[in-house]
């Protein structure tokens, strides 16, 4: 599809580009502007709008399209409003201008992760409302802050609040990842983020000496053990074509800290690791493994967790799950190929699943390179619009799932 001039641009694309220009970029997102944007959109669409301040300055905006049968549980469409930082010098276009090139690619931070999805939800609801539809189940759209830094001042708090329980969510959709092939990836579980800092203490002294028991030597041993484990998991993934990235445990060494001068042996050094633990791992045994690598390195080597998710959940992807049945039926009817996978990263879906709500991670972008968090993050307007079509089919099906035992 070739690009149209601005006067011919699809209004859904225009709204998408407007949202992309709001600078909700970490570490200082302009959440006020995002909330105002959704309030205004709610007004235009005739949707209920509720603001829940889960922490000072951290507002969850809830837009609601009531269903015809209030006894049924609702459909929750979640998206986060924050985006990750940019390295502006590596971008072909200003990442907050939402520039559209002559082919129709829209360049912006958040184009894939996940401002596209927020607008696709809204535009699908708009279309269905304009066509005069009503569905039995209520549809709530939640726009949440803070996901990109862990969701601790966003969804993690929101799911504990009475306002969340009052939504009576029976099923949720949240973000997925683009797929470069013709297929669409859908995520039914997630790896658990474990952020681990290993601190090593040892003998300080003059750096000209062969000092024994130094912090660096012991830290080196732990780093070796963990990177050997990384290599093992990588080989396991490489050698088995049936395994996807989310099915093995990954780890990266992301920070090294310590030292004051070239010629002073420091008494303390630390290494930080980002583990993503596969859902089928025995968590207790895995933690013991980490502890034993530290112990094997010598005295004075300890670890602490900056993040340690312990509640991985799996949403069934067979017809025993009526939500999956409805979701996959629509995709089949639309001739979309689905690739069910475990999310390699972490999303707010982990909090939603942990309070007992089945959830899928889905960002309808096929034939699209995976550019989330990358330079030149972009999405073709035709792929974006196709996503609106997909939600326009998914929402009626999900919001019409007949009464379930869990609804009463
Ligand atoms: C682990 S906190 C979540 C932040 C981000 N979504 C990630 O997966 O890294
Ligand atoms: Zn995201
Ligand atoms: Zn992200």
Swiss-Prot record:
EC number: 3.5.1.14
Covalent S-S links between cysteines: none
Effect caused by changing residue 386 to C: In ACY1D; loss of activity
Linked pathology: Aminoacylase-1 deficiency: An enzymatic deficiency resulting in encephalopathy, unspecific psychomotor delay, psychomotor delay with atrophy of the vermis and syringomyelia, marked muscular hypotonia or normal clinical features. Epileptic seizures are a frequent feature. All affected individuals exhibit markedly increased urinary excretion of several N-acetylated amino acids.
Similarity field: Belongs to the peptidase M20A family.
Primary role: Catalyzes the hydrolysis of N-acetylated amino acids to acetate and free amino acids.
Protein name: Aminoacylase-1
């Amino acid at each position: 599809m070739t690009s149209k001039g601005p006067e011919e641009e699809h209004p859904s694309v225009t709204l998408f580009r407007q949202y992309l220009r709001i600078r909700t970029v970490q570490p200082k997102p302009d959440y006020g502007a995002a909330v105002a944007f959704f309030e205004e959109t709610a007004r235009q669409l005739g949707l209920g709008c509720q603001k829940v301040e889960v922490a000072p300055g951290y507002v969850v905006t809830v837009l609601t399209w009531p269903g015809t049968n209030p006894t049924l549980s609702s459909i929750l469409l979640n998206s986060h409003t924050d985006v990750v930082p940019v390295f502006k010098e590596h971008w072909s276009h200003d990442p907050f201008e939402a520039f559209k090139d002559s082919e129709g690619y829209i360049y912006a931070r958040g184009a894939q992760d996940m401002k596209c999805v927020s607008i696709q939800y809204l535009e699908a609801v708009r279309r269905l409302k304009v066509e005069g539809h009503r569905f039995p189940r209520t549809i709530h759209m939640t726009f949440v802050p803070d996901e990109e830094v862990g969701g601790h001042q966003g969804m993690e708090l929101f799911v504990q609040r009475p306002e969340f329980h009052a939504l009576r969510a029976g099923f949720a959709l949240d973000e997925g990842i683009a797929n470069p092939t013709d297929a669409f990836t859908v995520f039914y579980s997630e790896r658990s983020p474990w952020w681990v800092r290993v601190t090593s203490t040892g003998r300080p002294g003059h750096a000209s000496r062969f000092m024994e028991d130094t912090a660096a030597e012991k830290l080196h041993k732990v780093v070796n053990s963990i990177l050997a484990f990384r290599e093992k998991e990588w080989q396991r993934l490489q050698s088995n074509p049936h395994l996807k990235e989310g099915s093995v445990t990954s780890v990266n060494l992301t920070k090294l800290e310590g030292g004051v001068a070239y010629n002073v042996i420091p008494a303390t050094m630390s290494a930080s690791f980002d583990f993503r633990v596969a859902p089928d791992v025995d968590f207790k045994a895995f933690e013991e493994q980490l502890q034993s690598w530290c112990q094997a390195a010598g005295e004075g080597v300890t670890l602490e967790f900056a993040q340690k998710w312990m509640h991985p959940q799996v949403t069934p992807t067979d017809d025993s799950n009526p939500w999956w049945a409805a979701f996959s039926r629509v995709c089949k009817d639309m001739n979309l190929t689905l690739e069910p996978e475990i999310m390699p990263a972490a999303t707010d879906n982990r909090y939603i699943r942990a309070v007992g709500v089945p959830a899928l991670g889905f960002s309808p972008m096929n034939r699209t390179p995976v550019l989330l968090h990358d330079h030149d993050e972009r999405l073709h307007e035709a792929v974006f619009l196709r996503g609106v079509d997909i939600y326009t089919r998914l929402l009626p099906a999900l919001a019409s799932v007949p009464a379930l035992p869990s609804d009463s």
